[in-house]
Amino acid sequence: MRKKNFLNKVLQNTSCPQGFWGRMILRGMNCFHASLANRGMKQVEWQPNWNVLDIGCGGGANLKRLLNLCPKGNIYGIDLSEESVSFAQKYNEKDLNKRCFIQQGNVCSLPYEDGFFNAITAFETVYFWSPVDKALSEVARVLRKGGCFLISLEASDPELGKMWTERIDGMVVYTPAELEERLHEAGFSSIRTIRKKEEIHIIAYK
């Protein structure tokens, strides 16, 4: 049974940030996930006019990076957490509702038209998608034919990941093979995985 101590309560904000500790977590995400995001983004040949969706946009730092990578495109962010949406909107205030559009929503029911995006990103968030197969099918639905889906994760070993999954409700750590299989089932045809220790970047094309 999971201990209800203070640290575990704070860590619940990694999946759906709320309140003061949620905002602290979001600030930390913007800082400490930067190197992971940059390494992942280097695996994609970004085009200036792409429309890109970042799922689980958190504190909004990756939206700002995508705005720079696609200077003539539109960047969208979605997050289950109202706190995250508010934080990300403030972080990207300069471009908000011009080239940057951020809203609250669930990955299992994305509020976008079929084939709307050239690329979709997911940084440190797939752990919390439930049911994950439904979520991946939704990603495939809103991605254009030939579009790119980038997943970047710091954890890819379920056994080592127990230090987190035993503390954070609903968190699941997947192996690269598990994610690749689920991506194939969701309709992705070309999948490449880059792994360095436990960090993985999966680039999947529809």
Regions found by a protein language model. Name each.
Residues K4-K9, P17, W21-L26, N30, ...:
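C-terminal alpha-helical "lid/dimerization" subdomain adjacent to the S-adenosyl-L-methionine
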Residues C31-W50, R65:
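Conserved alpha-helix/loop element of class I SAM-dependent methyltransferases that forms part
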Residues V44-W46, L69-C70, L96, L143:
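A generic alpha-to-beta junction signature in SAM-dependent methyltransferases
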Residues W50, G73, G147:
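Glycine-centered, small-residue-biased loops immediately flanking beta-strands
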Residues L53-S109:
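Class I SAM-dependent methyltransferase SAM/SAH-binding core
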Residues C108-A119:
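A short acidic, Gly/Pro-enriched loop at the edge of an enzyme's catalytic core
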Residues A119-P131:
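A short SAM/SAH-binding and catalytic strip from SAM-dependent methyltransferases
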Residues D133-K145:
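A short glycine-rich, Lys/Arg-flanked "PGG" loop and its adjoining helix->strand segment in the class I
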